[in-house]
A protein has these predicted regions:
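Conserved small/polar residues in nucleotide/adenosyl-binding loops
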Residues: 212-219
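N-terminal helix-turn-helix
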Residues: 1-57
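Solvent-exposed beta-strand sheet faces enriched in polar/charged residues
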Residues: 31, 38-40, 78, 88, ...
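Extended hydrophobic
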Residues: 147-211
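All-alpha effector-binding/dimerization core of bacterial HTH-type transcriptional repressors
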Residues: 48-96, 121-124, 133
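Short, solvent-exposed recognition segments
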Residues: 97-174
């Protein structure tokens, strides 16, 4: 309860009423032994409702599945969520961990190939706004490696390169030994709405090879 009070800024009475209501609705459940709270199963229903309501996800699912079969590598579709990408569709390889199979995880735009492919399709003023606000984000729980790019000038250069190439890359920035290549999905106004990303091991792939294979799958 104290943690919820700290996060919400509400007093104890308000927090207790709020948690009681969420438990009654099924969005919160009591933790093991009746201690604390965990997300409730009802959240899964809302996730289902959302996924079913987005036509892009339905149309993209066969493509994502085909790309994964052709490359035998992880393929993901992520949506934009302000300063983050949030994984919506994920097709895995047998070597992936459980957490990497789950939709809903979010990562910063500035630190991912998918995010930078989105930024590459935005005007410069919007890119600068993303860079400025991202610099203020807490990064304590964000996956990173010694190779993660955090310098705004370097990120800006990577975005400009992605504009020229039509795709963005990230080498070992979220996970050592992993290479990511991504391209943005644009709407009818040529605004980015999502990104498709393919990930391979640096020991097995280089960027041109991964691009060739993903292009072949797309065809």
């Amino acid at each position: 309860m104290n943690e919820l009070m700290e996060i919400t800024g509400f007093d104890r009475s308000t927090t207790q009423r709020m948690t009681h209501t969420l438990v009654q609705l099924g969005y919160l459940e009591r933790g093991p032994g009746g201690k604390g709270y965990t997300p409730g199963k009802k959240i899964l229903q809302r996730s289902f409702d959302y996924m079913r309501s987005v036509p892009l996800l339905e149309r993209a699912t066969p493509l994502i599945a085909e790309m994964q079969r052709e490359t035998n590598e992880r393929v993901e579709l992520s949506l934009i969520s302000d300063l983050y990408i949030i994984f919506a569709l994920r097709r895995q390889t047998k070597r992936q961990t459980f957490s990497s199979t789950l939709a809903g995880r979010e990562l910063p735009l500035v630190q991912t190939a998918g995010g930078r492919s989105i930024m590459a399709n935005l005007p410069d003023d919007e890119v600068e706004d993303i860079l400025a606000r991202s610099a203020l984000m807490p990064m304590d729980n964000i996956p990173s490696t010694p190779k993660t790019n955090n310098d705004p000038d370097r990120i800006r250069a990577l975005v400009h390169r992605a504009r020229e190439d039509g795709y963005a890359t990230a080498v070992e920035e979220s996970l050592l030994g992993e290479l990511n290549v991504a391209t943005a999905i644009l709407d009818n106004r040529h605004r980015p709405v999502a990104t498709i990303q393919i990930a391979g091991l640096t020991s097995e792939w280089d960027t041109p090879c991964l691009l060739y294979t993903s292009d072949a799958a797309d065809e």
